[in-house]
From Swiss-Prot:
Keyword Repressor in record: no
Bilayer-spanning residue ranges: 20-40, 58-78, 92-112, 133-153, 176-196, 242-262, 278-298
Protein name: Serpentine receptor class X 45
Cellular component terms per the entry's GO annotation: plasma membrane
Main location: membrane
Species in which this protein is naturally found: Caenorhabditis elegans
Annotated membrane topology: Multi-pass membrane protein
Amino acid sequence: MFQILMENVEVQHIDRIAALLIFFTSFIGFACNTFIAFYIRRLSLLRNSFGRLLQLQAAGDAVFVLVWAFYFAPVLFFDIKPLQSLAIAARFAQLCLICYDISIYTHLVISLNRFISLYFPTSYQNIFTERFTTFLICSIIFVSFGFSWFLVIRDCQMGFSIPRWMLDYVSPPCEMINVYYAEFFRGLIVISMFAITNSFTFCRMHMHNRKKQTATVFETTQQKKRRAVETRFVQQVTMQGLLYVIELVTYFYISLRFPVPLEPVELAKSSNRWPNFLLTTYAWILVHALDGVITLIFNKQFRSVLRHPCRSQEALNISKTPSRRSRFTTNRDESNRKKSSILACTFISNSNTGYGSSVHV
């Protein structure tokens, strides 16, 4: 079935439109995520557990959209027959699955990271140590590679279907019932964990902000800035988690309402072709592209670099150097801040800036 769908189908004008949509969306996502992955370690604010997890997430997203922008989209647009062979397409499809798993598992860990820092702020640094973060990163990569190779062992390989504009499993020899339930239950677990964790996190942050509004007059400038950063970051994590939930729901459930035939002739006439593509392949690509866009929107440090690309690293981090007044204020309110700060352990760098560091928002 796959050989008919891949190699014996001529590319039409409508196929090239889909290829352009895939390319431009993937390229934007690649630019944003690559910028984040390379630049994040230069920010002292993100030299911590969260920064390392965010870097892994951005790297996975960048490689994922890179494959779509510079392999699948050109193959579809230019109808490159030599690159449509299963031996080549299956390897790139396998790489996409690995990067997708890395991204989604990293999102789960980051959501749990936010949850712990929100409900157990005093224990956060003892839990998310440098060693434990390294263990989590290695585990995410290992599990992602393991699931991909499990599919290969079960003779379940994926290739790009030109008529359907999506990745298809080669069946036979792949037993689709096994793949469906593996993907179905994994998707169900991920959706549940995303929804529950992010709901608790967002509700807790909302309650915290309402409580703080009654005591705003007693907050120092440092505490107000820090709370603003904490609020924006919870909004970022909630937004990214919500997008992944929507993508999983559309891919595994809503798209079933728009079935498409397998035969190329009937598929070309099907009115469900575009809805199925937008709910599956494009939603899959879009969520990885928007990951980087959302991170840039909610983090002023990254936007400052985009506005001033020639500005030195010292100039960008100058606001993090504590003044005499900020050190005096911090020492005076240190005990109160330890009690009231919910996510400070995430946003305050463990570098030599210390507790007096000024959060640049």
